[in-house]
Amino acid sequence: MNNNKGGFLRSSVFYIFIFLAVVGMVYGLFGNDKTTTKTITSSEFIKALNDKELKSVTVQPGNSIYNVTGTYKKAQTATKDKGLSLFQPTQKVTKFTSTLLPNDASLKSVTDAATKTKTELVTKQAENSGFWLNLLVSLVPVLLIVAVFYLMMNQAGGGKGGQGGMMSFGKSKAKPSDPKDNKVRFADVAGAEEEKQELVEVVEFLKAPKKFVNLGARIPKGVLLEGPPGTGKTLLAKAVAGEASVPFFSMSGSDFVEMFVGVGASRVRDLFENAKKSAPAIIFIDEIDAVGRRRGTGMGGGNDEREQTLNQILIEMDGFEGSEGVIILASTNRSDVLDPALLRSGRFDRKILVGAPDVKGREAILNVHAKNKPLADNVDLKAIAQQTPGYVGADLENLLNEAALLAARRNKSKVDAADIDEAEDRIFQGPAKTNHNMSESERRTTAYHEAGHALVGLVRSEASVVRKVTIVPRGRIGGYALMTPKNDRYNLKYSEAKEQLAGLMGGRASEIFMFNEASSGASNDFQQATGLARQMVTAFGMSDKLGMVQLEGNASVGYADQAGNRAYSEETARLIDEEVRRLAREAFDDAIAILRDNKDKLTAIAEALLEVETLDEKQIKDIYLTGTFTRKDIQDDTELAKAKSFEEAKAAADAKDSQAEQRFEKQDEEKSSDDHSESKNEDTDSTDKSETDDNNTENK
């Protein structure tokens, strides 16, 4: 709207100038009457007066001069005088105007000349309007400057109630939220029951403080939510805002600091002042590590500004005046970099770790996000929760959302297990490259590589299970073997770590064992294996040579300063490298031994991969135990992937849907014919018949 107003103003001024120009032209052409007034100098006036050319003279005091007007006895002829119109070269002049110096000598000379020539002389008093006119003329520029300055200030401030303008830098952007606008409640937060209870207590204290005050308790001044990304820290804060019947101020840590010095501290003061006026109130600072980092670890003016902002937060939370009636919630996934003064009791009294949910928590989260999604009968949310250890709430929500998008792409009315399985692959590995043409040699190498991972994982299966093996290219990989822990893992044993290392080395071991040649496909395996082996040696104390010490793996351990200088000697570094190589070599030798003892099973898994490209957990176990597996109908999106336009993609999806309908109709016809034949058997007991129908349905 501001742009439109500015354009209208500019166009109005333009039309005003056009109008004035036209008026000036009209006045120049037609405005001058035939009786023209001529402006003459003082000398010309005195000469004309002495020559008896003037009929009458009028003298009137003006602005520091005497204004003289009068008429000629005879009309004068004027030629192109500057006081005349350009379109009238010659005119008859009967009147004149002139000026005199405002002194007695000038006035006496005019009076004497008029008396001598017997010319009529008239004197008038000065007009009072001149004073007001002069005053107005002098005030107009001042008023214009004041108006322009006011408009600039108003525009810089963002208008009425505006934010982000030049003059509002020191004002906090946080506004109290209306609980009616926030639909998130504690019932919408699943998988974090203990964390939720801690925050429910805070809300209860605000609503009914007498229950706690009677026992001498005080509400925590600050609650810090810490944990990995995606675990629901901000969602918990939204639930607090939705449940609390008090003003809720929300602000990001990065919103405090701007390009001007002192803005951050000013915004902190303004935020807490507004919260204190609305007390009891809650302040939520998201990603507080953006402003609450440890002091003295950086250089430059930006760091000084951040430290000044942090100091103001420390003062407001627990300074001389305190912040009575105001509770501070904050979230971060980097609590290790926060300043110790910020974390001490009296500021953040309660620290809540919001970690990855366990299997029950994952199932509860899946149930929450599946409420608005129609699921097929073959979808088991409990099984999905068991198969997704380490997933956080954001991952699970994205998993079901991607599955719903895939089901819509395939023109399904419900989300089935195949959609969820494909969605998991797409999220973590990328979409399948169905048009990626691999040579037969590359496919065979990839198949044996992934079969090596799977076989070692099947043999060393005390802690992990092989869920899937595929040679379908996705993202930057040509295939992968998915192995997940059997249960939620909170500690890693030495034997379990050795299992993981052997599984990671299974791919390269299979290449060497079958083809006696290595490929670049194991680079990511080596990266993971090296990282795990290094952690075993430097962080977990699993090396006899180095002992039970922590050399790396912590921000305060392993490095003496910010420049990255190591706190241990070169000899220790050499021992670390030797131990990492030893663990990797032992894992490789273990994998080679497993493959040598199970060569027939390795070949069976690889040939099955070359045939169907993807094997699930049951198929892999069947091949390992029996040498055969059951093939299943796999969703094929090849035609959808090849489509070049929306119309072609829609046609391909409709064709697939039509084929599926024909298949279902055929099954229904077979079922109806079976039911019809059974109805003819009059000797069958009704109870037995009902059981037979149920069995037939289950088999189908």
Swiss-Prot record:
In Swiss-Prot or TrEMBL terms, this protein is called ATP-dependent zinc metalloprotease FtsH
Residue ranges, annotated region (Disordered): 644-700
Cross-referenced SMART domains: AAA
Taxonomic lineage: Bacteria, Bacillati, Bacillota, Bacilli, Lactobacillales
Q: Which stretches of this protein does UniProt put in the Extracellular compartment?
A: 32-130
| Cofactors that this protein relies on | Zn(2+)
Q: Which PANTHER family match?
A: ATP-DEPENDENT ZINC METALLOPROTEASE FTSH 1, CHLOROPLASTIC-RELATED, METALLOPROTEASE M41 FTSH
Q: What biological-process terms (Gene Ontology) are attached? A: protein catabolic process; proteolysis
Sorted alphabetically, which SUPFAM superfamilies does this protein's record hold?
A: FtsH protease domain-like, P-loop containing nucleoside triphosphate hydrolases
- Cysteine pairs bridged by disulfides in the record: none
Cytoplasmic compartment segments:
1-10, 152-700
Lipid bilayer topology: Multi-pass membrane protein
Q: How is the cofactor bound?
A: Binds 1 zinc ion per subunit.
* Organism this protein belongs to: Leuconostoc mesenteroides subsp. mesenteroides (strain ATCC 8293 / DSM 20343 / BCRC 11652 / CCM 1803 / JCM 6124 / NCDO 523 / NBRC 100496 / NCIMB 8023 / NCTC 12954 / NRRL B-1118 / 37Y)
What's a single GO CC term here?
plasma membrane
Q: Where are the transmembrane segments?
A: 11-31, 131-151
Q: What does this protein do?
A: Acts as a processive, ATP-dependent zinc metallopeptidase for both cytoplasmic and membrane proteins. Plays a role in the quality control of integral membrane proteins.
- What keyword terms does UniProt attach to this protein? ATP-binding, Cell membrane, Hydrolase, Membrane, Metal-binding, Metalloprotease, Nucleotide-binding, Protease, Transmembrane, Transmembrane helix, Zinc
* Gene from which the chain derives: ftsH
Q: Is Zinc among this UniProt entry's keywords?
A: yes
Query: What is its subcellular localisation?
Result: Cell membrane
Q: Assembly and partners?
A: Homohexamer.
What is the similarity comment for this entry?
A: In the central section; belongs to the AAA ATPase family.
Keyword Phosphoprotein listed: no
Q: Which residues form the active site?
A: 450
